[in-house]
């Protein structure tokens, strides 16, 4: 009968549901069914003593023992257990509730009042007090489904009924819907009907725990005086063995919080850990979690695995305990009780991530959802100015030190000394050579970042350039004279064949040429120098040595060489004193050359030369 009531979609704290439980309870003799099971018989004095009297100091052991009347001490003592079953203590208010729900009083002597009902413990036909008989077409024995038609006939509801409208009853709350669903599920699986308890002697203790969803069998009927509710709720969780306290039938019992986890199972269906059996944890903790469980969360259609963050992020992120899951996943799939305060051990290899012993040192790490990463190294760890690929400029600035040191070794290894044979040529030199010499000066002017005044200073070099390019007329040469931006201009001239031995007449002509060059170059205040290098020339006569005139600044060093001769003409300011060596003797030149050989080469100048590889001759040309 109780199972049928629970399957009815009504609020268990409404008046019809309370009245149904009272009539079907064997503990109360003041209210019972009539002979046909279609009406109620209410003994007013006994009803007031059992259900409506305020709590008294008398003992409840004598309640219901007497067969006559209920106004004595037994009635007062019996009513002390359930003072709030009904909020009123007036019998007239109880009758008013019956009338409000459509009950009508039956006149005594009619067919419905043919005698007392077959209730147990009824010693007589309630001759000691008035007996009230009420009838309702929707309140019948063994038909609890009719209770949904009992409406509260207020003025508004009466108007609706008169207009033919349907008056909705109060919908069942969440707890009632849970009971209805669980009752229907367990009714099909149960094999025996619900067993009722006998009245007082047996105390209401904890019932044997039952696993699985909430079933009707977990609501045990208990009508003892010391229990405030006609039924007690036994929690489905194996950690809670105490009955849920209820104050009365007029209030909706608050259900305990039982959730379904992400696997769709109730707490009783999940194997729980015996470690927390006495803690009262409402949500189960999965057993053997660290090594064997591959717990999978499945929001919507995607499968998301619980994994620990990559070990590369351990050093940058020190605290994972307050990590919030992504917004794209529902919060219902991240119960905090499942993975609460679980420190990952070092042997957690069954999970999808790889855990190292360094990661286990963080005792407060929780498992969180990490978005997939394309690379194991975060991009933000790289510097912002990290070049993606080596550009041409970077390649140009790379200095091949091996080539520099190889050049130094070659300079020290050969004992030969070559000099440049300067030949003054008339204007009948090929126009291509003159054009090439003129091409040098615009390049020097354009490559120099100075203003137009610098260009005007370089204009007097035009005839000099024509003479420079005409020095090697009649020989096979390769001129690499692209001028760099440095103030020193290096002109490297290679010849394939040696020149003839110069004569004294040629030396005199060379002296005149140098005097002319000195007069033209001293007018230019630009602190730049022109270097001419020629290889493969044999050292012919001492007259060639004596014919060379060098103007050097003491602050600058001449690049020492045993294979290369230099003709350095420095264009300094007019007011700046220059050191003129004049026509030096061969012995003096060799002495200066030997002194310069004792010095170490200027590596800074060699590095600058090697940096400008496009201005430097190839090794094949050097060997020629």
Swiss-Prot record:
Gene3D superfamilies per UniProt: Winged helix-like DNA-binding domain superfamily/Winged helix DNA-binding domain
GO annotation terms (biological process): cell differentiation; male meiotic nuclear division; spermatogenesis
Gene name of the record: Hsf5
Coiled-coil region list: none
Biased composition (Low complexity): 186-197, 442-457
Biased composition (Gly residues): 58-77, 112-127
InterPro entries named among the record's database cross-references: HSF_DNA-bd (IPR000232), WH-like_DNA-bd_sf (IPR036388), WH_DNA-bd_sf (IPR036390)
GO CC terms of this entry: nucleus; XY body
DNA-binding region: 11-228
Sites of Phosphoserine modification: 600
UniProt entry keywords in alphabetical sequence: Activator, Chromosome, Differentiation, DNA-binding, Meiosis, Nucleus, Phosphoprotein, Repressor, Spermatogenesis, Transcription, Transcription regulation
Protein name: Heat shock factor protein 5
Annotated stretches, region: Disordered: 52-77, 112-138, 186-214, 429-461, 572-605
Domain of life: Eukaryota
Subunit structure: Homooligomer.
Mutant lacking the gene: phenotype: Male mice are sterile. Show impaired spermatogenesis and spermatocytes fail to progress beyond the pachytene stage and are consequently eliminated by apoptosis. Spermatocytes show aberrant sex chromosome remodeling and silencing.
Molecular function GO terms recorded: DNA-binding transcription activator activity; DNA-binding transcription repressor activity; sequence-specific double-stranded DNA binding
Family per record: Belongs to the HSF family.
Family matches, as Pfam families: HSF_DNA-bind
Main localization of the protein described in the UniProt heading: nucleus
DNA-binding keyword on record: yes
Species of origin: Mus musculus
Subcellular location: Nucleus; Chromosome
Free-text function comment from the UniProt entry: DNA-binding transcription factor that is essential for male fertility, spermatogenesis and meiotic prophase progression in spermatocytes under non-stress conditions. Positvely and negatively regulates gene expression to ensure progression of meiotic prophase beyond pachytene stage in spermatocytes. Plays a role in male germline meiotic sex chromosome remodeling and silencing through regulation of SMARCA4.
Tissue: Highly expressed in testis particularly in spermatocytes (at protein level). Not expressed in fetal testis and ovary.
């Amino acid at each position: 009968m109780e199972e049928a009531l629970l399957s009815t979609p009504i609020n268990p704290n409404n008046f019809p549901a309370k009245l149904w439980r009272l009539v079907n309870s064997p503990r109360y003799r003041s209210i019972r069914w009539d002979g046909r099971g279609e009406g109620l018989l209410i003994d007013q004095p006994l009803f007031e003593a059992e259900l409506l009297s305020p709590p008294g100091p008398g003992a409840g052991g004598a309640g219901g023992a007497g067969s006559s009347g209920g106004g004595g001490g037994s009635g007062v003592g019996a009513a002390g257990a359930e003072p709030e079953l009904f909020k009123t203590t007036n019998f007239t208010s109880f009758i008013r509730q019956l009338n409000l729900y459509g009950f009508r009083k039956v006149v005594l002597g009619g067919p419905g009042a043919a005698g007392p009902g077959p209730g147990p413990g009824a010693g007589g036909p309630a001759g000691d007090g008035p007996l009230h008989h009420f009838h309702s077409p929707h309140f019948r024995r063994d038909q609890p489904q009719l209770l949904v038609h009992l409406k509260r006939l207020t003025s508004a509801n009466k108007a609706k009924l008169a207009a033919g409208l349907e008056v909705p009853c109060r919908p069942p709350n969440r707890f009632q819907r849970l009971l209805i669903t669980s009752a229907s599920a367990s009714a099909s699986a149960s094999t025996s009907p619900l067993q009722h308890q006998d009245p007082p002697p047996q105390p209401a203790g904890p019932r044997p725990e039952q696993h699985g969803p909430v079933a009707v069998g977990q609501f045990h009927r208990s009508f003892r005086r010391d229990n405030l509710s006609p039924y007690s709720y036994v929690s489905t969780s194996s950690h809670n063995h105490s009955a849920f306290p209820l104050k009365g039938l007029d209030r909706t019992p608050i259900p305990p919080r039982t959730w379904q986890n992400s696997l769709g199972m109730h707490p009783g269906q999940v194997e729980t850990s015996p470690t927390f059996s006495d803690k009262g944890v409402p949500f189960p903790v999965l057993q053997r979690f660290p090594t064997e469980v591959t717990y999978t969360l499945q929001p919507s259609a995607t499968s998301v695995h619980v994994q620990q963050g990559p070990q590369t992020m351990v050093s940058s992120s020190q605290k994972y305990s307050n990590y919030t899951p992504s917004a794209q996943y529902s919060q219902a799939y991240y119960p905090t009780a499942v993975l609460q305060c679980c420190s990952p051990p070092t042997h957690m290899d069954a999970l999808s991530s790889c855990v190292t012993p360094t990661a286990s040192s963080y005792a407060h790490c929780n498992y969180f959802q990490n978005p997939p990463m394309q690379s194991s190294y975060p991009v933000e760890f790289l510097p912002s100015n990290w070049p993606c690929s080596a550009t041409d400029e970077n390649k140009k600035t790379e200095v091949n030190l091996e080539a520099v040191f190889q050049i130094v070794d070659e300079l020290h290894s050969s004992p030969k000394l070559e000099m440049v044979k300067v030949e003054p040529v008339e204007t009948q030199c090929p126009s291509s050579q003159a054009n090439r010499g003129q091409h040098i000066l615009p390049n020097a002017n354009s490559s120099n970042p100075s203003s137009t005044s610098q260009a005007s200073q370089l204009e007097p070099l035009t005839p000099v350039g024509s003479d420079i390019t005409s020095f090697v007329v009649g020989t096979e040469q390769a001129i690499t004279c692209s001028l760099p931006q440095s103030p020193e201009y290096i002109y490297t001239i290679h010849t394939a064949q040696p020149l003839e031995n110069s004569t004294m007449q040629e030396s005199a002509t060379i002296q005149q040429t140098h005097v002319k060059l000195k007069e033209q170059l001293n007018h230019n205040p630009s602190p730049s120098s022109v270097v001419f290098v020629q290889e493969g020339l044999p050292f012919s006569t001492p007259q060639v040595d004596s014919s060379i005139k060098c103007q050097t600044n003491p602050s600058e060093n001449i690049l020492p060489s045993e294979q290369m001769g230099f003709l350095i003409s420095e264009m300094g300011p007019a007011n700046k004193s220059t050191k003129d060596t004049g026509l030096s003797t061969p012995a003096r030149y060799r002495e200066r050359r030997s002194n310069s050989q004792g010095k170490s080469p200027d590596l800074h100048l060699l590095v600058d030369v090697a940096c400008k590889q496009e201005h430097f001759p190839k090794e094949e040309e050097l060997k020629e």
